[in-house]
Swiss-Prot record:
This is Exodeoxyribonuclease 7 small subunit. It catalyses: Exonucleolytic cleavage in either 5'- to 3'- or 3'- to 5'-direction to yield nucleoside 5'-phosphates. Bidirectionally degrades single-stranded DNA into large acid-insoluble oligonucleotides, which are then degraded further into small acid-soluble oligonucleotides. SUPFAM superfamilies: XseB-like. Keywords: Cytoplasm, Exonuclease, Hydrolase, Nuclease. It comes from Chlamydia pneumoniae. The keyword RNA-binding does not apply. Heterooligomer composed of large and small subunits. Pfam families: Exonuc_VII_S. The keyword Membrane does not apply. Its EC number is 3.1.11.6. GO terms for cellular component: cytosol; exodeoxyribonuclease VII complex. GO terms for molecular function: exodeoxyribonuclease VII activity. The gene is xseB. One of its GO terms (biological process) is DNA catabolic process.
Amino acid sequence: MEEVPFENAMQRLEEIVDLMNQPTTSLDASLALYEEADALMRICESRIRQVEQRVRELAEKRHESSLFEEQAVVR
């Protein structure tokens, strides 16, 4: 599955849940939907991990910067 924007993947996951909850959805269709949902969840989880890592990096830089500023004030 090609790279899908996070928001689009989440929207499609909601659609899949709705489709799977319909009593008219066949077993084979449910399986296909489940497989699609699995791929979309992997995309979302990967993107969340990327964002979390970037936030950690930014927080660490901010912390290092404030330590540097504190040391400069002490001198």
